[in-house]
Amino acid sequence: MSSRNQRSRITSSFFVSFFTRTILLLLILLLGFCNGARTNTNVFNSKPHKKHNDAVSSSTKQFLGFLPRHFPVPASGPSRKHNDIGLLSWHRSSP
């Protein structure tokens, strides 16, 4: 009887170790396919993909989908037209 118990222990321990090894192997293989395991760290891609059939795609015509690019952004410094002080600004007809 003792040999029978010993065989069942060996068989059950072999099955448990085989089962855990298989689960660990599958887990390691599946982790490689997750998006969090990417090796590429360029998450924020600043250059949009260009379409081959379009000369200029719609994503390059606008800034974040709100402002068209052909309108220039005004400078933050003082302009001659609005911020001149003195008599020169009174007589000057063009900026």
UniProtKB/Swiss-Prot annotation:
May be involved in floral abscission. IDL2 is only partially redundant with IDA. The lineage of its organism: Eukaryota, Viridiplantae, Streptophyta, Embryophyta, Tracheophyta. The keyword Secreted applies. Residues 1-35 form the signal peptide. The gene is IDL2. It is found in: Secreted, Extracellular space. GO terms for biological process: floral organ abscission. It comes from Arabidopsis thaliana. One of its GO terms (cellular component) is extracellular region. Its main location: secreted. This is Protein IDA-LIKE 2. Residues 75-95 are annotated as: Disordered. InterPro entries: IDA-like. It comes from the Eukaryota. Keywords: Secreted, Signal. PANTHER family: PROTEIN IDA-LIKE 2 (PTHR33599:SF15), PROTEIN IDA-LIKE 5 (PTHR33599). Expressed in leaves, buds, flowers, seedlings and seeds. Detected at the base of pedicel, in the floral and funicule abscission zones and in vascular tissues.
